[in-house]
C-alpha cells in the first residue's frame, strides 16, 4: 500500500518543477482535505449546514460549509510558508500571505464545489489549481500571478467527498487517485495513470434548462438521445449537480459534462480559473478534452479573477461532437 505522501516524493523527478516546496504544498492541500472530510461527515450534528446569509463575489448566497472549507484550506496553505497567496471562489480579491514573499507558488481554488448538495447528503468536492508566480520572488504577489492561462498550471486536482473520500491530481505526468482511509488517517493509492475509457456513453447536463441552451447544444442533446447502434447511442443521461462528482464518474465510466451558456448567463456559469482550468488539465492528462465550444479551455487568457466560461469536458470524441454541432447550428 502506497500513501499519497510516498507517491508524491517518488514521482518528483517526473515533472520539471520538482521541488520540496511543491511536495509540501500538495501535503498542505491533503491536510485541508482531511479536515473538510471530517467536518462534512458530521455537518448535520454541528451548525454548519445551510446558508450563511452572506454572498460571494458573484452575488451568490454562500453556504456555511463554503466559508468553513475556504478558511480551513487557506489556513493549511498559509501555515507551510510555501504559498505566496491564493485566489478563491469565496474571496472577492486575491489573498496575499504576509511573510511569504519568497514563496514560488500561488493556489486557486473552489473550496467546496456543489455545496448546495450538502443538505441532502449528495457528493461534493474541492478543486485546486497551482501555478508558479510570474512576479519577482521576494515581492508580494499581484493579480498578474493568478491571471495565467490554464496551460501554465504546475498541478491541479480535486477531492470528492462521497461514499469514500478520494483525492485525484496531476502534475502533468498522468492522473492519479487516492482513497482516504480514516482509520489510518492517510490517502492510499488506488488508481495510477487514470484514463477515460475509449468510448463514452454518458452525458451530464441540467436538461431542465434546455429551453435556454444555444441551438448547437440542443441539437447535441437530441443526438445523444437518438438510437444508432454504430455509435452506441442513445447515451445515458446522468447529472448530479456537483462538477467534481459528475466529472469523476465520467472519468471512470466515460462521458461528457456540459455547462453551456444560457440567456441568463451568456458567458457561461462555471469559473474559468477555479473550475474549468483545473478540470481541463486533468481531462487532457487522462486522454480527454475540454473546450468552451469553440476554443481549448487551457489556451484562454483570463481577464478577471471570477471570469465565467461555457464548459464541455470529457471523452475527446464527445467534446469534438459538441464543437461540431455548435459550429453547424449557430444561434440566429
Curated annotation (Swiss-Prot):
Metal-binding found in the keyword field: yes
Compartment(s): Cytoplasm
The enzyme's E.C. designation: 3.1.3.11
Binding sites annotated in the UniProt record for Mg(2+) 1: 89, 110, 112
EC top class, as a word: hydrolase
Cofactor note: Binds 2 magnesium ions per subunit.
Cofactor: Mg(2+)
InterPro entries (UniProt xref): FBPase_C_dom, FBPase_class-1, FBPase_N, FBPtase, Fructose_bisphosphatase_AS
SUPFAM superfamilies reported in the protein's UniProt record: Carbohydrate phosphatase (SSF56655)
Catalytic activity: beta-D-fructose 1,6-bisphosphate + H2O = beta-D-fructose 6-phosphate + phosphate
Molecular function GO labels: fructose 1,6-bisphosphate 1-phosphatase activity; magnesium ion binding
Gene Ontology biological-process annotations: fructose 1,6-bisphosphate metabolic process; fructose 6-phosphate metabolic process; fructose metabolic process; gluconeogenesis; sucrose biosynthetic process
Pfam families: FBPase, FBPase_C
Pathway recorded for this protein: Carbohydrate biosynthesis; gluconeogenesis
Keywords carried by this UniProt record: Carbohydrate metabolism, Cytoplasm, Hydrolase, Magnesium, Metal-binding
Residues that hold substrate according to the record: 113-116, 206, 239, 257-259, 269
Domain of life, per lineage: Bacteria
UniProt-annotated binding residues for Mg(2+) 2: 110, 113, 275
Subunit note: Homotetramer.
Family affiliation: Belongs to the FBPase class 1 family.
Protein name: Fructose-1,6-bisphosphatase class 1
Species classification: Bacteria, Pseudomonadati, Pseudomonadota, Gammaproteobacteria, Enterobacterales
Gene that encodes the chain: fbp
